[in-house]
């Protein structure tokens, strides 16, 4: 199991489009992918769960991956967040 804190840096935070990109990417991996903020943990493969975190710009979230491709999943998700979900601000 891997766990890593990261900060949401895109201007609109985890809005619908960003959440969709994150859940779609998470769904490509066999590993379980969880995301948490302020004590609430959700399945990162669930768009409703991710949106319920209400993570705006500057929010710190914790990613957790567990399974055979956990490192690849973690690296890909961190890259997506660092790239501002491809929104090119």
Curated annotation (Swiss-Prot):
Alphabetically ordered keywords of this record:
Cytoplasm, Phosphotransferase system, Sugar transport, Transport
Give the main localization category: cytoplasm
| Protein's UniProt keywords contain Lipid biosynthesis | no
Q: Where in the cell is it found?
A: Cytoplasm
Q: Which residues form the HPr domain?
A: 1-88
InterPro entries, per the entry: HPr, HPr-like, HPr-like_sf, PTS_HPr_His_P_site, PTS_HPr_Ser_P_site
Q: What does the UniProt function comment say about this protein?
A: General (non sugar-specific) component of the phosphoenolpyruvate-dependent sugar phosphotransferase system (sugar PTS). This major carbohydrate active-transport system catalyzes the phosphorylation of incoming sugar substrates concomitantly with their translocation across the cell membrane. The phosphoryl group from phosphoenolpyruvate (PEP) is transferred to the phosphoryl carrier protein HPr by enzyme I. Phospho-HPr then transfers it to the PTS EIIA domain.
Q: What is this protein called?
A: Phosphocarrier protein HPr
- In its UniProt entry, the species of origin is given as Cupriavidus necator (strain ATCC 17699 / DSM 428 / KCTC 22496 / NCIMB 10442 / H16 / Stanier 337) (Ralstonia eutropha)
